Structure formats: C-alpha cells, structure tokens
C-alpha cells in the first residue's frame, strides 16, 4: 500500500489522500470549535490571563482542592522546554516531554490524611479519553515515595506531605501520544463514620502539552549527540538553500518553533489531519500527517501553493521571513489556508512543526531535482525539428532546486539499520509542476536503491537518481523521435543542509554537503548498481539501454556561465570543432529563456541559429550576446536563466544537445545596529540597499522579523533612484535577552528577493 506505484497514487490522489475527521460523533463539530477557542485563548495569554475556576465546596467532610502548583518553569528547565514563549506567558503553560517525570503540588482546604482520603489523578487525552486506548490514565496516590512501575507505564509517587500540601512526581512513559493532556484530581473520604461521602473532582483548567523527547533513550526520536539536538531541535533560526547547483544561495529562515502561536497551531494541524489519538504516539504517523497537512490539498492544511504570478491576493512566497507568521495566521483564521507557499516555504513550516513537537528535523535542498511522473526513473525532454523544447510533451520535469525535510527517528517497521534520517516532503502535488507529499522514507534505503521500503521511497529515489533523456523529432524514426542523449549525472547533483554549529550571515560557509547520504558517488559501480537495482524493482530497466554508438567526429562544447550580477550583460557561446579529415556541415540552435525554479519556461529571451560548413579540423563559434534591456523585463521569480543548445551533423547524423542554467545575482541588504541592545530599551535598525539597476525602483517595501525582538512586520519605502544607496530605519524594542537573529527582505516592482540578516546579542 505504501511505497509502491507512485504513478497510481498521483492519478488517484484526490480520493486516496482525502482526509476527513476520524471522529464522527455528533459533538465533534462542537469539540473542534471548543478546541479552536481554547487555542486562540492560549495564544492570547501573553496579553491577558484567564482566571482559573475552582471546584465549589461540597461539605466539611470532603477533601477540597484549593490550588494546584504546576511548577511550570522548573519543569520546563528539566524537560528542555523553557524556550517556549507559552511557558513565560501571563498564565504559564506546562510543556513537558515524554519519557521523564514532572512535579506538581496540591494545596487542599484541610489537611490530607492518607488513611482516610482516597486520592487519584485522572489524566486524559483527546475528545473521548478511554482507558482501553491508553488515552485515559488513572493514577491512585498512595503513601509510597518511590515509583513502583517500570518506565514504560504511567506512575506517581508522593515526594512530600506537609499538612494540607502534598508534592507529587508523575512519571510519563516514553511512548505516550503527543498533544494536549488534561488532568483531574479526584478525592473521596473513606472513614467508617461517613462511609457514603461522594467523590469530589477538581479539574485543572490549565492544559498540559506533552511532546516527543529526543533526550530520552526510550523515545523513538532519541538523538544521542547534544550538538545535533541543539541544531535540529532547539535552533529556531536556520538557512534554507535555494539558487542553482553552480550558485547555491542560503536564505535565512526563522523557524520560530517556540513562538506562542506555534504549539496551538500544531494541535490544530493534528486535529485537522484526522490522525487517531493513539496514533499520535508514533512519530512515523505524525510526520506523515505533517507532510499532508502543511499543504492545503484535500485537507484544509496550512499553506496554499502557487508557483507563478499573480500573488496579489496573498503574500508572495519570497516575502515570508519565517514560519511563525504563517502558523499564527492559520490559527487566528481557524484553519483557513495561508497564501502562498513554494517548496522551501512548505519545508520551512514543516521543519517548524516537527521541531515544535520535539521531532529532530532539518531542511534538505536537492539541486536539479527530478519529478518523475511515470515511475520510469527517467526524465524525458522533447525537442521539435527546430531545436525548441516542446513544453507540454510530458509532465516530467527537473526543478533547479527542490526543498524537503529529513526527520530523525527509529524505524521499527523496517529491517534493522534503516532508522536515522527519514525524508518527508510537504510540498503538494500539482497537476503540471508540483511534486508529491512524501515520507517518511529511509534515507539509507534511498541511497541503496531499496525502493520497496515504506513510505514512498521510489519517488525520493527518482528525485536524486533519475536519468535525463533528450529526444528530438525525426521523420525517419519509427517512433517519430530520435534519442539525442542520456545524462546519468544531471539529477541530484548536490544536496545541502545547514551545517551543525556554524552560522554565516555573509556567505554560505554554513552549508553542509550531504549528497553522499542520499546517493553513492556519481559514476561509481555502487551508484549505477543502486539505480539498476531500483529500476529492476520498478520494472523499467529497459529504459536504461543505451543507443548504439554512432560516428561522432565533431566536438561541441557549451561554455558554462558561472554567474552575472543583475543589470549586467551576458554572453553565451558554443564552441564547434571538426575533428575529422572530411568536410562536415553542422546545423545548430542556441537559445536563452527565463525559467521558474520548477523548470517551467518563463519567457523566451533570445535565440540564434547557425549553419556551418567546417573544413577538416576547422573551429567555429555560435554565440549570443544578451543585454540587460533584453532580459530584465523577462526574468521571473528567482531570476534563473536556462540555456539550450542542439546541433546535428548532416554527413554522419551525429546529434548533440546540452543545457545549462544560471542565476542572475542580486545584492544583499546590509543591516546596522544603532544604539544599545538591551531588553526593554529601544534601538534603531538601519537597512541599506544599493540599487544595482539603471532604473527607478518603485512599490518598495521591507519585511523584518527577529525572534525575541519583534514579530514579522512590513514597512513601505519611497522610490529608490538608479544606483542609489537607500537607507531605511526602524525603531525596535527587544523583548528577550540572548543571541538574536534579525532577518529582512526587500521587494519592489523591478527587484525582488533581496535578503539580509544579522546576528546580535541582547543584554538583560
């Protein structure tokens, strides 16, 4: 069911992946409304508190709860949750991790007598907690000061008793469901003088979050290395790599998993997913739900995807600076999908949700990422007789980059050794250019070509290993097309993630190459064997049969363009050399177009034909010169340009094709701090931009975000003159001490996706 036949999954996804609430009781709608109200209320507690109501006194003989102390901050320090804003709100929220104990104190309205007062805790999870499902826990409080059960079970011990006050320590097993738990305290007098006294129940109004625990060896998300935990669980700012294989560009992203709106939004996501409450103990199923719910296809998820203009009715994907503003909007609108996201935005939000829930997670960027729609492990590109690409001949495509996530967990459902990093992808399927929601798929299984293991490993494998085949119209061929080229090294050329413990605001020294974790080195026997192993498993090994070699005595070479700065011209060249002792007649086509990062052609920029009669050992050049005026108005989202070159030798029927792409480089924003950085004290942030164009920039605005300093906000700016150095200043007041990251973006009608960031230290 899982991991096989992705082509069928694509065709049937509208029904196969449609998610509906699992609980169909008549009160489910009311339950969801109540949940939303509570989450919005909890999110708002940073600004106003909600008084706790108490159980009314039912008689002098009954043991009444006067108050409950949850030791929210003390428990948070022990459970590595002290960073969550909800812990420090006006009414602090208890946030715990499974697999370790926590402490509470209860004050009664009279002295507690263990011989007469029967006391128990009821801890429940979900709409209808049940003992049989493990979502309702009954914990009798005895006089024991030690735990009597093993660590796989809930338990409670009496740490201290002082008259009307008792202190309890409660043991949470390492395999309980994650989410919001509620607690009741039930007491009943058992004296012979008053044998019929009714039990009294006190419901704790404060909810308790229980999360996955990467610090606990018994938890399936356990991660041993402390530096890894700091990076993949605790780091709330990182980098997501975009750009191209030759020009990777790290974009600063604020994950913001500790922001006050994020955990409530995560609970809403899990509710909307329809995931069974008991299944929420399993990180495999939780991650699969995240993969489905971060996009809005079929299930009212977080983000709506859009890969081309217009974005006027929402926020353009490149204007987001982090995840928390997206999740906050989703929560405040009670689950209305937020507009708009693209793969790296989906991955950023998925990373935030996973880390917030305690699942170690990282973003992964695959350069030249294949979208194989027919499970052949090939990406077919088709060209007409004139050498122009036929855009709608296939739904296969190669994205200049695609971003997904890896999560860290054990995989008891797979053979030994396939735990560790698991790929999952929350980018939604689109009928023309989207990719599938995916995973979790064992990265080791992908590397080995073991595509039979759950979940969706065939698709992930093809993303990094598919072969690229070029075809051209040919009337003399039985199929109407001739095979120009097979490129086994075009796809999955580089996979990057942020390096542990390294942070670079001015370059990309913090990029880590993890290509070898996903695939063996290109050209090695191991690499080809993994591909052929996967091809045999999929039944399409015939696709890798190479054509018979033809006489090839004319040499062609498309010169790479490393990078150009926006506003500068560029030059494209194909070198041609007749290496034979005979005359050769060559027809060649060279073209340049803007492209979306998904590989879809944006606008054609320039095209040049060449017909040459080459004498023995003669050299020729086909080239095009492109000026700024010819390409600036034709650039699309990420300022990427695709080059195609195709040539045919008449005498030998030798054919040749090549492609290349590059990014037009944009300036960075420069951030300067004016004043002292101290909690509660205003300072000035100055943002500088040098206009690289010889034209006016209008409709200008900045987006700024800095966790612990300010949430995301937008400010407009005046028009910026040609080649002007513009400076915009804003006044900010830090809210929290410690190291803080400030991220800013700039956009105008003529220039978009200009980014800058700065690391600062805020004093208490």
Swiss-Prot record:
Localization terms from the record: Membrane
Membrane topology, record value: Peripheral membrane protein
Domain of life: Eukaryota
UniProt keyword list: Acyltransferase, Calcium, Membrane, Metal-binding, Transferase
Enzyme Commission no: 2.3.2.13
Tissue: Mainly expressed in hemocytes, hepatopancreas, and gastric tissues. On the other hand nothing was detected in the heart, intestine and muscle.
Sequence intervals crossing the membrane: none
GO molecular function: metal ion binding; protein-glutamine gamma-glutamyltransferase activity
Cofactor binding note: Binds 1 Ca(2+) ion per subunit.
Cellular component terms per the entry's GO annotation: membrane
Entry cofactors: Ca(2+)
SMART domains the record matches: TGc
Catalytic activities: L-glutaminyl-[protein] + L-lysyl-[protein] = [protein]-L-lysyl-N(6)-5-L-glutamyl-[protein] + NH4(+)
Positions that bind Ca(2+): 465, 467, 522, 527
Function text: Catalyzes the cross-linking of proteins and the conjugation of polyamines to proteins.
Similarity remark: Belongs to the transglutaminase superfamily. Transglutaminase family.
PANTHER family per the UniProt record, alphabetical: HEMOCYTE PROTEIN-GLUTAMINE GAMMA-GLUTAMYLTRANSFERASE-LIKE PROTEIN, PROTEIN-GLUTAMINE GAMMA-GLUTAMYLTRANSFERASE
Name of protein: Hemocyte protein-glutamine gamma-glutamyltransferase
Organism: Tachypleus tridentatus
